[in-house]
Structure formats: structure tokens, C-alpha cells
Design a protein with these regions (language model features):
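Conserved C-terminal structural/oligomerization subdomain of aldehyde/semialdehyde dehydrogenase
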Residues: 34, 78, 85-185
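ALDH superfamily catalytic-core signature
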Residues: 1-96, 114-129, 163
């Protein structure tokens, strides 16, 4: 779905030591994603929906590329010669309020903000206040106390909230759904 799904992950808050241990692996996995014609089933990803979406998503990548607080660490190439292809892109930002952390892109972009390990509760506040939108959200942790803190702080932040599962894991009508904010939840 090329990130064009309401439950696609578009932003992540990652503790520094976790990022140091998995950042390179994440980039390597994203770089393995094969993109091309939808009729070739060996492709995992294809074009975005139309030219308007292409222009909008490309604009986010271009602005991030020119922002000294952001760095495109993989992807970022856009090709509209035969379809509207945008590589899966990861942006690393130093600013938790940068454009791609607070706006809904609806495309193949993940922006990551790395926070100091001792700033978990501050990161939860950032998550809570980042955007008026959020159909889905996830927290990954092996620390039960942090899971509970995240649950308590973020339980009304998204319509679907996952613990140690991807945000696109929903099975319609198989879980409670509701919430607040401007996502139609």
C-alpha cells in the first residue's frame, strides 16, 4: 500500500541505545524492498496512487532533504516517468516537531526521532502532542513498567493502540475501536 493506509507507521520515537543497536539493520531491511510494476509479484511495493500524491510526498522528501535538522538516511528517490514511484524513505530528525513528525504524509516515509534513554516520559508527551491525527499507534518494549506508562499516557491518542505489534495489525471487527482526535475515530 506504499504507506497509503491509515494505519501505516509514519513516525517513530526511538531510545538512543535502541537506535544504536538496530538503526543500521532497519536501513538494510528497507533497502531490500523491491519496488516496481504491480503485475510483477516479485515486487513488494509499487507506485503511489496518482500524480497529486506523488507531488505531495516528494515535496515532504525535498523539504526534509533541505532541512539541516533532518537527514534522509535511505530512500528518497522519486520517479514519475512511468508511474509515480517513490522509494521507501527513512528520515532521521533532530526535531520532534519537524514537518514529517507532525503531519500525515500518507506515503512511504517513516520519520524517526531518537531521544535520550532517560527521556522516555518526555517522548510519551511528544507522542501525545505530535498530531491531531492518529488512527493507530504502537509501543514496543520488554519493560512492563514502561508499557504501562505508555498505555496510561497514550490510550486515547489513537483509535487502535498496539503493544509489541505493528500498527497495521488490525483485523476489522475483531478488536475494540474508538478514540479521539481528528482521524474519524
Amino acid at each position: 500500500y506504499q504507506g497509503q493506509k491509515c494505519s501505516a507507521a509514519s513516525r517513530a520515537y526511538v531510545p538512543k541505545t535502541v537506535w544504536e543497536s538496530m538503526g543500521n539493520d532497519l536501513v538494510a531491511e528497507v533497502e531490500k524492498i523491491k519496488m516496481g510494476d504491480a503485475s510483477d509479484f516479485s515486487n513488494f511495493m509499487t507506485a503511489v496512487i496518482d500524480g497529486r500524491a506523488f507531488d505531495k510526498i516528494k515535496g515532504y522528501i525535498d523539504r526534509a532533504s533541505n532541512n539541516p535538522e533532518c537527514k534522509v538516511i535511505t530512500g528518497g528517490k522519486c520517479d514519475n516517468e512511468s508511474g509515480w514511484f517513490i522509494e521507501p524513505t527513512i528520515i532521521l530528525t533532530e526535531n520532534p516537531n519537524s514537518e514529517t513528525m507532525v503531519e500525515e504524509i500518507f506515503g512511504p516515509i517513516l520519520t524517526i526521532y531518537v531521544y535520550e534513554d532517560n527521556a522516555f516520559e518526555d517522548a510519551l508527551d511528544l507522542c501525545d502532542k505530535a498530531s491531531p491525527y492518529a488512527l493507530t499507534g504502537s509501543i514496543f518494549s520488554s519493560n512492563e513498567e514502561n508499557i504501562q506508562k505508555a498505555y496510561d499516557k497514550l490510550r486515547f491518542t489513537a483509535g487502535n493502540f498496539y503493544i509489541n505489534d505493528k500498527p497495521t495489525g488490525a483485523v476489522v471487527a475483531q478488536q475494540p475501536f474508538g478514540g479521539a482526535r481528528a482521524s474519524g475515530t
